[in-house]
C-alpha cells in the first residue's frame, strides 16, 4: 500500500533569475553631506550598477495528480512579469516609478519584487524573496 495516500504533503519550490540594473542610493530627506556619510560611494551622482540575482520561493501542497507545487513554466512567467520586465537593464531610480519616492536599497528592491509577485501568484503561495546585490550582500524578505 502507498504510504502517501491521503497525506497532504507540502513543499517549497525556488527559482532563480538574474537582472542588471543601475541606481543611486540617495534620500531626499537627507542633506548632500548626510547622504554621502550614510551611503558612501553608492551615493555617486552618476549612480552605479549591479548584476542582481533573485531567488523566489513559493510553498504549497504537492498536487497529487501533477506532483507539483506549481508548474515551473508558470513561475517563470510570473517572475518575468514581476522582475525582469520592470527591472532588467533599467535605472531603478529613473525608470521604475516605485523608486521615485523610495530609496533603491536592496531591501526596497526585495519589497518591490514581493509586492509585484503577490499581485500575480495564487494567494498564500509566495514564501520568500531573496535578492543578491552581490555575492556578499543579500536581503531576504518574507512580507513581514
Curated annotation (Swiss-Prot):
* Active site positions, chain numbering: 42, 89, 133
Q: What is its EC number?
A: 4.2.3.12
Name its GO BP terms in alphabetical order. tetrahydrobiopterin biosynthetic process
Task: Enumerate the Gene3D superfamilies for this protein.
Answer: 6-pyruvoyl tetrahydropterin synthase/QueD (3.30.479.10)
Extra information: The active site is at the interface between 2 subunits. The proton acceptor Cys is on one subunit, and the charge relay system is on the other subunit.
Description of how the protein assembles with itself and partners: Homohexamer formed of two homotrimers in a head to head fashion.
Task: Provide the protein name.
Answer: 6-pyruvoyl tetrahydrobiopterin synthase
High-level lineage: Eukaryota, Metazoa, Chordata, Craniata, Vertebrata
Amino acid at each position: 500500500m502507498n504510504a502517501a495516500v491521503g497525506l497532504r504533503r507540502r513543499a517549497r519550490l525556488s527559482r532563480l533569475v538574474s537582472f542588471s540594473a543601475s541606481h543611486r542610493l540617495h534620500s531626499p530627506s537627507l542633506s548632500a553631506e548626510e547622504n554621502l556619510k550614510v551611503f558612501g560611494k553608492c551615493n555617486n551622482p552618476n549612480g552605479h550598477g549591479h548584476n542582481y540575482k533573485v531567488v523566489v520561493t513559493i510553498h504549497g501542497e504537492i498536487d497529487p495528480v501533477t506532483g507539483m507545487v506549481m508548474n515551473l513554466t508558470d513561475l517563470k512567467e510570473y517572475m518575468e512579469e514581476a522582475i525582469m520586465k520592470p527591472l532588467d537593464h533599467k535605472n531603478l531610480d529613473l525608470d521604475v516609478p516605485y523608486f521615485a519616492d523610495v530609496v533603491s536599497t536592496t531591501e526596497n528592491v526585495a519589497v518591490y519584487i514581493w509586492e509585484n509577485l503577490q499581485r500575480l501568484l495564487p494567494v498564500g503561495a509566495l514564501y520568500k524573496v531573496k535578492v543578491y546585490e552581490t555575492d556578499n550582500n543579500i536581503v531576504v524578505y518574507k512580507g513581514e
